[in-house]
């Protein structure tokens, strides 16, 4: 399986994300924000964490209008897989590939620690390695991770089983404890916690590998 990991000015988790894909068995290509096309035959696009373009205007707003973002949107619209982590989640909401917005944390402070999550659905390639209700632990590192959406969007996410992860102890004020959501076709996932920072026991736990292995396995079955 082939993965492409985007690098924007200000990205700081792109190498971690590429390494996680490689550990799961993917052939990884790094792409630059000025590129106008994805590599031939890419199965999944990874949008990493960091502070793309310094978080100017809004987190992810400038990155969402970069040349490579247009190629990513086309990939998603064709049914391709996309994984956006932290700033990558913010980029996905700015592009419209995922609904809602990521606002300033309720406590108005940057949060950097490990959090416990509940796998809210196993019905996606990203989460199929777990059962709904399983607990996993990933790091978080964000200032603007407070997921916000209108009541209609929240009801749709619940009704369509598109909430992928929830916080067991909400650290940032996210509505309904939401930590990650899926697109309508379940092939785009955005989440604020960092599974790519939890792929080796030396990092304090390897729960994140469950996501990457499940994703590659799920894509292979399509």
UniProtKB/Swiss-Prot annotation:
> Does the record bear Heme in its keywords?
no
Report if keyword Hydrolase is assigned.
yes
Glutamine amidotransferase type-1 domain spans which residues? 2-222
| One GO biological process term | 'de novo' IMP biosynthetic process
Tell me the compartments it is located in: Cytoplasm
**What EC number(s) has UniProt assigned to this enzyme?**
6.3.5.3, 3.5.1.2
Q: Which InterPro entries match?
A: Class_I_gatase-like, PRibForGlyAmidine_synth_PurQ
The Gene Ontology terms for molecular function here are: ATP binding; glutaminase activity; phosphoribosylformylglycinamidine synthase activity
Q: Which reaction does it catalyse?
A: N(2)-formyl-N(1)-(5-phospho-beta-D-ribosyl)glycinamide + L-glutamine + ATP + H2O = 2-formamido-N(1)-(5-O-phospho-beta-D-ribosyl)acetamidine + L-glutamate + ADP + phosphate + H(+); L-glutamine + H2O = L-glutamate + NH4(+)
Q: Which residues form the active site?
A: 86, 194, 196
GO cellular component terms given for this protein: cytoplasm
Q: What is its main location?
A: cytoplasm
Annotated SUPFAM superfamilies: Class I glutamine amidotransferase-like
* Pathway of action: Purine metabolism; IMP biosynthesis via de novo pathway; 5-amino-1-(5-phospho-D-ribosyl)imidazole from N(2)-formyl-N(1)-(5-phospho-D-ribosyl)glycinamide: step 1/2
SMART domains tied to this protein: GATase_5
Ordered alphabetically, the record's keywords are: ATP-binding, Cytoplasm, Glutamine amidotransferase, Hydrolase, Ligase, Nucleotide-binding, Purine biosynthesis
The record describes its quaternary structure and partners as: Part of the FGAM synthase complex composed of 1 PurL, 1 PurQ and 2 PurS subunits.
Role of this protein? Part of the phosphoribosylformylglycinamidine synthase complex involved in the purines biosynthetic pathway. Catalyzes the ATP-dependent conversion of formylglycinamide ribonucleotide (FGAR) and glutamine to yield formylglycinamidine ribonucleotide (FGAM) and glutamate. The FGAM synthase complex is composed of three subunits. PurQ produces an ammonia molecule by converting glutamine to glutamate. PurL transfers the ammonia molecule to FGAR to form FGAM in an ATP-dependent manner.
Which NCBIfam families does its entry note? FGAM_synth_I, PRK03619.1
HAMAP family in alphabetical order: PurQ (MF_00421)
State what protein this is by name.
Phosphoribosylformylglycinamidine synthase subunit PurQ
Q: What organism does this protein naturally occur in?
A: Cereibacter sphaeroides (strain ATCC 17023 / DSM 158 / JCM 6121 / CCUG 31486 / LMG 2827 / NBRC 12203 / NCIMB 8253 / ATH 2.4.1.)
């Amino acid at each position: 399986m082939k993965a492409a990991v985007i690098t924007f000015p200000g990205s700081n988790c792109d190498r971690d994300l590429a390494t996680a894909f490689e550990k799961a068995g993917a052939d990884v290509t790094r792409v630059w924000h000025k590129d106008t096309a994805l590599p031939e035959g890419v199965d999944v696009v990874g949008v990493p964490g960091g502070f793309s373009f310094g978080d100017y205007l809004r987190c992810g707003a400038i990155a969402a209008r970069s040349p490579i973002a247009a190629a990513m949107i086309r990939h998603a619209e064709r049914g391709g897989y996309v994984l956006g982590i932290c700033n990558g989640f913010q980029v996905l909401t700015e592009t419209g590939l995922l609904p809602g917005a990521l606002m300033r944390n309720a406590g108005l402070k940057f949060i950097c620690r490990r959090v416990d999550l509940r796998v809210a659905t196993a019905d996606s390639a990203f989460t199929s390695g777990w059962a709904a209700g399983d607990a996993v632990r990933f790091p978080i590192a964000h200032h603007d991770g407070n997921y916000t959406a209108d009541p209609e969007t929240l009801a749709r996410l619940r009704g369509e089983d598109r909430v992928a992860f929830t916080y067991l102890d909400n650290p940032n004020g996210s509505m309904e404890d939401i930590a990650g959501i899926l697109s309508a076709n379940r092939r785009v996932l955005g989440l604020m916690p960092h599974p790519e920072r939890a792929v080796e026991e030396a990092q304090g736990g390897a729960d994140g590998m469950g996501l990457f292995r499940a994703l590659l396995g799920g894509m292979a079955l399509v």
